[in-house]
Structure formats: structure tokens, C-alpha cells
């Protein structure tokens, strides 16, 4: 019988659905294993061959764990809210819900063809009201919580209100936006609105004024990773920095726990380090600086308190509120012009860019230890969100301060004995202090001269604490997350506004569903798209949405017009997969207790400082409320690499429609243009197909070499815009899903990026055919016999079992595919058709090529799926070699090799080697001085 992959794959995909093969339920008798992929955003382009890489890798592992007897949860869903669907809706007028469903259906069709073991009964879509019910619920919980630093957890906001009513802020140690100081009487005397404004300083979900990346053309705030070179990643529209009142999440309150949690998870060292750097813990001191001729005082944070004697200027972030206060009238025009320029740069660009820019404010601060006046500058190398948004600049011992001082000709004052700062700053935290204070300074006060840097830091901290000039402080780079977007296609906030302050709708009224709007653009008055909704007001009496015309600001109030960002729906989706049809809770306690957290999470490294931070924060918050039993959501994380596209180029001669072949292009002034890889074969362009590809090329002319047009090529990201996308449907149709699955694994290690190249795919397809031929000959005769296997056959099998078991545990799937090929070749050479061997071979191959393995498993007479078989264990006795190959050396130089029985004695080996005629040749009749036998390795004859 011929291997007909199309019929086989279609047959078994239907059987899996009909038999609910991959449906899973909690089973206390089995150990659980939760496998999860970062779910996809369903774009209109569908999947290309790069997308399934991680899915295939995780699916192999999921199937493997099931064969080991684990109860495996392997769900899939869709991150369905997002900017692309909304942009498409703006361009076409088609509702995002329609395009999203169409895209999801296309994704599902493609995923099903590849044969994944997903439990589709647990499918979730973040745009489904039944799903975002629980996103809204979590937001309400965050709004009604504060973070207690003493207990290191979130607590109900009612407890904080009670504490304020009784003691004011006395004795409070809580996470907040700014330090506040008031008595119980002062609190109790405030109006409801005033109290609500104060509570906003403590809530975990709060409204705050933040600097954002604002894109006027898109009418929304963008995340840092959505902005490239000052323009939006999608559409290329200009982006500016702007202060806006936004919903935020107090992620910073969890900074230390996010840092500590990294010690408990199995992630790569590089990814952990990325998160550590993003969280950015630093121990230092806050110091207070007064402004000359003013009663204004401001605070700076420094990790080098020892360098305070070397401060020669101060720098404010352009966004700092101090800029307006400290800019003198003489400097205002220059400062305003500088601020206008910096608005066009994102924080990420400012961090990466080492060019120097700045402007003098006109004001001076006073060094609290020397009483010297210090000029206050403004520069975008200082960020408002880190520390206090103001720094003391010590150019002798900080490279960015040094570059600034050199550029603006400011004083550089070294503080370390023997350091040379003529060409660069001395940043090392080592050496002996000097100039602290400088010679001739008034006596008294802090003296650091002669101390080591470490001693000086400690002494300075003690001094400023004792004198009230500052305090010891641990600072974090991690910022609170901006949580609102001025878009339509996102989760609505369960928020209405009373007297300008936000209030939550009752949890019993969730979900608050996204309303219909006539337009997806901002309103004429600049409101977000939800401003177009005519039925978007909250009736607090009847607890329902009502028409806007009914708003009376007594019982009916306007609803929030912003929507939640893309990461809202992806921050706790792993929990919802556990219990997706529960209408009473995000996840029931019993189900949560069983599945706990994700054992294996697979996704890209690009989410290291976004999704993976937000999910960990979200989970820790829910853990505080007793919702998630595990504090960390993802125990083991594997980052799959990227399958890159192999792009092709044609070269158009400037100002013509003539295209010159690759090796002739240097003779002309040309422009390289991406060309569709589907009309190129082995870098040779199909000329007629190229002319038909796009209207502007219909009259194209060509300068050929040897009658052919040779295209250029490059390995790049697989993308529609580069015309290098390979559709997996084409591969499945031509070779089958099992071939695609194995070939993607064969391309290289899962974690590494590698170019897509179909040159080796025929070899993988031939392997599956050869595997099939162990069961059927060319005439369709069934070959399998129920006879005892030979030692050689069992050796080939058990060598494979050992290799593949180890490889799967290490995600070394590429070497597993090689091992399968070697084993099948060996069994073919041995003409092995023994059921004892082939049955176990099927089980080991099944995670990689499930369709063909199900078919052959069935032919062996099994009545259940191969998924429910048992993973075989290798037997070491079959792996012991009968003979050992020895290298025979003379005076340390290898001359030839000899085979000996594995249990041969050294004396017997020596005698046999010396008697060999080749030894007689190399000894030239001389008696050896010494013969050294290294067991199982080498025989060295010393002459």
C-alpha cells in the first residue's frame, strides 16, 4: 500500500475530532502537565511557515508527556484585540469583529491541517465578552486595592480608608505615587471627591498624568515597542511625547517580588538578565538640593553618594515639573524650543542615543555639603520616570555626564586619587577619595578624603540621614504600566465618571460590552472613538447601559471612553484556559489547585519586557487575592527562534523599467527591489510571471546573463512586505503535515533563528516513505511479523529511544530527526519487520509525525490512539558494544586500528597486536621497550 499522506492526514484529523482525542479534564489520579504557546494575534495574512515553529516544538513535548502518563493541558486561543483590525476597519468600514472572526477561521483551518493536539474545547478569544468579563473583573480588583509594603501584598482599599480615618498617614508604609502627610482629622474633613483624588495616589489601578508616546494620526497612545525612529511601527506616522491623564497599573509596587521570582523559574539566563535590567534595582540615596534665591527644593537619587563633592551641574528631564518653575525669563524661548524638539523622541530612543543635547535653565541649585551654586540644565538623557527626574551630574565619574560637560564646557572635578579624566570619565567604584572636600574648604561637616569608595558611600549615607539632608533609598527602573488606549477595538473599562472622578460598575453587571459606533476614528472634538457611541452611559439605579441623552449626573453618568491596551487580555489568559466555561469565577479554586501554573511556556524573546513582565505582575496580584495558587505563572520558558525568509531581489536601472541581472548590476546605477519568492526558482526569475505580477512591470525589459535573470538574495525576517512569505498550506499540500512538522524541527535548534530553505524537505519526506516501507512493500504487501527481534534490531531501537528521550527533554529536536533517519536506515538494512521493534518505533516517532504513526499503529491491530500508548524505556543491555575499536600507536603516533571483544584481557590484546604483521613492519624487528594498553581506547607500543 502506497503512503498517501493526504488521505491519512485527513482521516486522522477527523477521527481526533470525533473521538475528542485531545480533550482533557482534571484527573486527580494523574500528574498534570500544562503546556502553553503564546497565543497568536489573528492577522489577515494568516500563518506563514515561521509561525508554527514554536507550536510544533511544544506539541511534540505535549504528546511526549502524555505518552509518559501525564494529564496534559495543551490549549489554544486568540489574542483578538489589536490595532491592525481597527486600522483595517477605518480603511474599509468593515467592523473589526467581522474581520477578526474571518481571520480566526483562517488560522483555525491552517492550524488543524498541521495536526496539533490542542484541546479546542478550551479555546478563548480576548474579544469575547465572556472572556473579557474577567479582565474587567481583575481591573476592578486592582482599583479597589492598594499595596502594603510591610505585608508585601495587595490589600483591600477599604483597609487603607479605615487607617486614614483613624490615624491619617502616620505609620503607613504603602506603595504610592508621591509621599503624603495628613492627619485623621484632615482626612475626615475632606469631601468625597478630595478623598477619591488622594486614594488615586495609592490604588493599584489609578488615573495619573504620564508621559506617553502620542500618535496624532492614529489618535492613540503607543507602547515603546510600537514606535521605531520616532514614527509608529504601523503606518509610519509621527509620534510625539505628551503628558496625558491615563489609566495606569502600579506595577512598580511589585518590583522586588518580580525580581525575587526570577530565582524560582527555569528561564534562560539571558532572559532573566533582560528582566533584571528592565526592573533595574539600585541601592542609593535621595538627597535634597535647594534652589538659589528661591524656596524651591528638589530631590535627586544617586547610587554614588560618595561623589557629591564632584557635582558641577544638575540636569532635569525635559518632562519634569521643575522645568517650568526653574526656567528664567531670559532662557524661556531657548528652553521652549528644546522641549519642542525632545517631544519627538521616545524614551527608548533617548536611552539608546548617545548624542549630546541640552539647554541651561537659568537657575542654580545649592550643593548641600559645600554650599556652592550649581547650574541647572535640561537634557533628554535624563528620564522623568526614573528616580526623581533630576540628577546631580558628576562628570569625572559618569560617562554621560562627562560627554555633556565636554560638549558644554562645564567643570570636571575628579574625586579619586590617580584617576585620569582628560579623555574619559573614571566610572569604576574603586580607589581612594580626594577633593572631598577640596583643599581650602571650611572645616567641619563630612570628610571623605583617604577613604575607599565603598567606605565613602557608606559614610555619606549615614551623614545625610543623620543631618536630614536625605535618606537611604532602593530605587527601581521599572515604571508603572500605562493601561489605556484611545482606540475602539479593545476591552471597555468598567468605569463611569461622577463629579469628574472614576467609579466602578458592580461586578455583578459584568461584562460591560463594547458598544457599536458609527466611526472608528476619534471624534471631531478629539475624544476616543467610543465618543461616537450614542448608548454609552451608566444607570446606577437600574445597573445597565443607557442612552447618552439620559445622562443627568445624579443617577446616570458617562462611561469611560478609553479602552484597555493589547496586553490586558493576554495577562491572565493562562488561568482562563484552566476553566474557560466557568461563569462564576476566573478559575475555580479546585481547578486552580490542580493545574497550578504553566509547566512549559513557548514564545518569542520579544515579549521579555512587555507581556512577560505584565503577566507576572498580574498573576502576583491575583495570588495576593487567593485567586492563583502559584505566584509565578510560567515555570519553564523556551524561546523559539525565528524562521527567517530567504528574500529575492531584482535590480532596476535608475529612471528606467529595465532590470539587470545580479552579476551585471555593478555596471549600472540600480535600485534593489524585493520580488515575490514564488516566481523565483533557485534564484532564477520567471520573467513572464514577473511581468504578470504587478501592472508596473508589464512592460519590463531585462539585461540577462547566459539567457537567465539571476536574482540577488538575503536572509531576512519573513514578512508580506518583503514578499518572502511561505504559506504552510502549500507545504502540507505538497508533502504533508508530518513532513512539515519534522522538517521545521530538522532546520536547527528550536531556540535559534534559521532561514527557511526547502532544499532539505525532500529528504525528510523520503524518510517518512522509508519508515512506511518497513510496514508495506512496493506492491502493498503487509510486511510486519510477530517474531522475536534480533540483537542488532533491538540495539538500533534502544539506541534511538535513549537518544530521542534525551533530545526531547533538551528540546534538541533537530538531532532527534537525524536519529530517526539513522535508525530507519539501520532497520531497513537489517530488513527488520518485527512487530516488537516497529510498535515501539511508532510510539517514539508519534510526537513528531502523529498522522502516519496513528495509521501504522492502527494497522498493528491497536484499538486506541497511539497518544494513549506508553513511552518506551531503553534497556542498557542492548546498548553495550560487543567489540571495541582500538587505535594502535607506535611511539605515540597512530598507525592503524584493530577490533577486539569488549571483554578482552589486556594481555590477550597485547599479544594479538604484537603478532599482527603491521606491527612487525613498524617495530622493524626490534623488541618493544614497553606496551601500554588503555582499556577500550588505545594500545601504544614504545620502541
Swiss-Prot record:
CDD domains xref list: Anticodon_Ia_Leu_BEm
Record keyword Glycoprotein present: no
Alphabetical list of PANTHER family matching this protein: LEUCINE--TRNA LIGASE, MITOCHONDRIAL, LEUCYL-TRNA SYNTHETASE
Family: Belongs to the class-I aminoacyl-tRNA synthetase family.
Compartments where located: Cytoplasm
Binding site for ATP: 720
Statement: the UniProt record of this protein carries the keyword Nucleotide-binding: yes
Descriptive protein name: Leucine--tRNA ligase
InterPro entries reported in the protein's UniProt record: aa-tRNA-synth_I_CS, Leu-tRNA-ligase, Leu_tRNA-synth_edit, M/V/L/I-tRNA-synth_anticd-bd, Methionyl/Leucyl_tRNA_Synth, Rossmann-like_a/b/a_fold, tRNAsynth_Ia_anticodon-bd, Val/Leu/Ile-tRNA-synth_edit
EC number(s) from the headed UniProt entry: 6.1.1.4
GO biological process: leucyl-tRNA aminoacylation
UniProt keyword terms in alphabetical order: Aminoacyl-tRNA synthetase, ATP-binding, Cytoplasm, Ligase, Nucleotide-binding, Protein biosynthesis
Source organism phylogeny: Bacteria, Pseudomonadati, Bacteroidota, Bacteroidia, Bacteroidales
Organism: Bacteroides fragilis (strain YCH46)
Amino acid at each position: 500500500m502506497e503512503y498517501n499522506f493526504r488521505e491519512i492526514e485527513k482521516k486522522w484529523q477527523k477521527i481526533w475530532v470525533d473521538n475528542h482525542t485531545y480533550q482533557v479534564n482534571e484527573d486527580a489520579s494523574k500528574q498534570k502537565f500544562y503546556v502553553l504557546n503564546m497565543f497568536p494575534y489573528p492577522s489577515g495574512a494568516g500563518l506563514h511557515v515561521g509561525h508554527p515553529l514554536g507550536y510544533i516544538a511544544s506539541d511534540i513535548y505535549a504528546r511526549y508527556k502524555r505518552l509518559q502518563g501525564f494529564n496534559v493541558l495543551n490549549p489554544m486561543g486568540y489574542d483578538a484585540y489589536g490595532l491592525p483590525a481597527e486600522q483595517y476597519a477605518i480603511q474599509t468600514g468593515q467592523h473589526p469583529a467581522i474581520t477578526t472572526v474571518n481571520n480566526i477561521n483562517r488560522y483555525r483551518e491552517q492550524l488543524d491541517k498541521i495536526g496539533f493536539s490542542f484541546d479546542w474545547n478550551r479555546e478563548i478569544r480576548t474579544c469575547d465578552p465572556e472572556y473579557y468579563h474577567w479582565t474587567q473583573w481583575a481591573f476592578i480588583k486592582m482599583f479597589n486595592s492598594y499595596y502594603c509594603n510591610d505585608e508585601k501584598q495587595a490589600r483591600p482599599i477599604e483597609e487603607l480608608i479605615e487607617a486614614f480615618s483613624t490615624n491619617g498617614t502616620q505609620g503607613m508604609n504603602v506603595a504610592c505615587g508621591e509621599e503624603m502627610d495628613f492627619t485623621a482629622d484632615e482626612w475626615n474633613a475632606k469631601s468625597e471627591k478630595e478623598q477619591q483624588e488622594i486614594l488615586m495616589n495609592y490604588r493599584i489601578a489609578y488615573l495619573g498624568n504620564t508621559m506617553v508616546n502620542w500618535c496624532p494620526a492614529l489618535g492613540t497612545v503607543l507602547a515603546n515597542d510600537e514606535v521605531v525612529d520616532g514614527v509608529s511601527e504601523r503606518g509610519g506616522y509621527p509620534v510625539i511625547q505628551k503628558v496625558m491623564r491615563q489609566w495606569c497599573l502600579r506595577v512598580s509596587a511589585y518590583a522586588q517580588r518580580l525580581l525575587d521570582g526570577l530565582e524560582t523559574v527555569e528561564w534562560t539566563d539571558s532572559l532573566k538578565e533582560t528582566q533584571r535590567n528592565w526592573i533595574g534595582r539600585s541601592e542609593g540615596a535621595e538627597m535634597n538640593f535647594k534652589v538659589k534665591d528661591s524656596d524651591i527644593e528638589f530631590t535627586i537619587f544617586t547610587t554614588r553618594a560618595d561623589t557629591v563633592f564632584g557635582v558641577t551641574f544638575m540636569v532635569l528631564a525635559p518632562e519634569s515639573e521643575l522645568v517650568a518653575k526653574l526656567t528664567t525669563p531670559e532662557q524661556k524661548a531657548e528652553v521652549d524650543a528644546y522641549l519642542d524638539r525632545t517631544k519627538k523622541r521616545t524614551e527608548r530612543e533617548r536611552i539608546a542615543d548617545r548624542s549630546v543635547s541640552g539647554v541651561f535653565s537659568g537657575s542654580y541649585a545649592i550643593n548641600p555639603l559645600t554650599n556652592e551654586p550649581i547650574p541647572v540644565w535640561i537634557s533628554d538623557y535624563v528620564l522623568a520616570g526614573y528616580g526623581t527626574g533630576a540628577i546631580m551630574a558628576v562628570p569625572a565619574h559618569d560617562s554621560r555626564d562627562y560627554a555633556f560637560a565636554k560638549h558644554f564646557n562645564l567643570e570636571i572635578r575628579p574625586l579619586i586619587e590617580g584617576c585620569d579624566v582628560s579623555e574619559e570619565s573614571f566610572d569604576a567604584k574603586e580607589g581612594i577619595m580626594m577633593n572631598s572636600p577640596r583643599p581650602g574648604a571650611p572645616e567641619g561637616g563630612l570628610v571623605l578624603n583617604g577613604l575607599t569608595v565603598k567606605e565613602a558611600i557608606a559614610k555619606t549615607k549615614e551623614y545625610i540621614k543623620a543631618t536630614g539632608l536625605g535618606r537611604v533609598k532602593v530605587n527601581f527602573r521599572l515604571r508603572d504600566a500605562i493601561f489605556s488606549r484611545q482606540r475602539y477595538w479593545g476591552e471597555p473599562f468598567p468605569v463611569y465618571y461622577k463629579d469628574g472622578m472614576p467609579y466602578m460598575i458592580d461586578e455583578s453587571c459584568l461584562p460591560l460590552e463594547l458598544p457599536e459606533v458609527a466611526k472608528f476614528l476619534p471624534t471631531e472634538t478629539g475624544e476616543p472613538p467610543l465618543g461616537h457611541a450614542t448608548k454609552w452611559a451608566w444607570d446606577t439605579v437600574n445597573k445597565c447601559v443607557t442612552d447618552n441623552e439620559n445622562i443627568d449626573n445624579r443617577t446616570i453618568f458617562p462611561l469611560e471612553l478609553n479602552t484597555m491596551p493589547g496586553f490586558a487580555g493576554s495577562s491572565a489568559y493562562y488561568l482562563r484556559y484552566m476553566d474557560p466555561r466557568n461563569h462564576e469565577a476566573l478559575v475555580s479554586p479546585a481547578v486552580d489547585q490542580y493545574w497550578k501554573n504553566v509547566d512549559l511556556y513557548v514564545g518569542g524573546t520579544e515579549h521579555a519586557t512587555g507581556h512577560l513582565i505584565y503577566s507576572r505582575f498580574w498573576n502576583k496580584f491575583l495570588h495576593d487575592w487567593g485567586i492563583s495558587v502559584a505566584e509565578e505563572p510560567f515555570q519553564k520558558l523556551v524561546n523559539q527562534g525565528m524562521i527567517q525568509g530567504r528574500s529575492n531581489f531584482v535590480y532596476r536601472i535608475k529612471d528606467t523599467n529595465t532590470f539587470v541581472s545580479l552579476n551585471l548590476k555593478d555596471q549600472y546605477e540600480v535600485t534593489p527591489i524585493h520580488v515575490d519568492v514564488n516566481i523565483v526558482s533557485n534564484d532564477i526569475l520567471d520573467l513572464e510571471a514577473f511581468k504578470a505580477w504587478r501592472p508596473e512591470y508589464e512592460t519590463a525589459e531585462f539585461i540577462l546573463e547566459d539567457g537567465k535573470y539571476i536574482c540577488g538574495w538575503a536572509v531576512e525576517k519573513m514578512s508580506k512586505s518583503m514578499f518572502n512569505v511561505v504559506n504552510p498550506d502549500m507545504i502540507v499540500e505538497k508533502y504533508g503535515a508530518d513532513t512539515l512538522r519534522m522538517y521545521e524541527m530538522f532546520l536547527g535548534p528550536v531556540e535559534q533563528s534559521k532561514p527557511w530553505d526547502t532544499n532539505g524537505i525532500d529528504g525528510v519526506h523520503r524518510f517518512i516513505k522509508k519508515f512506511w516501507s518497513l510496514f508495506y512493500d512496493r506492491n502493498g504487501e503487509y510486511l510486519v511479523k510477530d517474531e522475536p527481534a534480533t540483537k542488532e534490531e533491538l540495539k538500533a531501537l534502544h539506541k534511538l529511544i535513549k537518544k530521542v528521550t534525551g533530545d526531547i527533554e533538551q528540546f534538541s529536536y533537530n538531532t532527534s530527526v537525524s536519529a530517526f533517519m539513522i535508525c530507519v536506515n539501520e532497520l531497513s538494512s537489517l530488513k527488520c519487520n518485527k512487530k516488537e521493534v516497529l510498535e515501539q518505533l511508532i510510539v517514539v516517532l508519534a510526537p513528531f509525525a502523529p498522522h502516519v504513526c496513528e495509521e501504522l499503529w492502527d494497522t498493528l491491530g491497536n484499538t486506541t490512539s497511539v497518544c494513549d500508548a506508553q513511552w518506551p524505556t531503553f534497556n542498557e543491555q542492548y546498548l553495550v558494544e560487543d567489540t571495541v575499536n582500538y587505535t594502535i600507536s607506535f611511539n605515540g603516533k597512530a598507525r592503524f586500528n584493530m577490533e577486539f571483544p569488549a571483554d578482552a584481557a589486556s594481555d590477550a590484546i597485547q599479544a594479538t597486536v604484537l603478532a599482527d604483521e603491521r606491527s612487525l613492519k613498524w617495530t622493524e624487528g626490534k623488541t618493544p621497550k614497553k606496551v601500554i594498553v588503555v582499556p577500550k581506547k588505545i594500545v601504544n607500543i614504545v620502541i
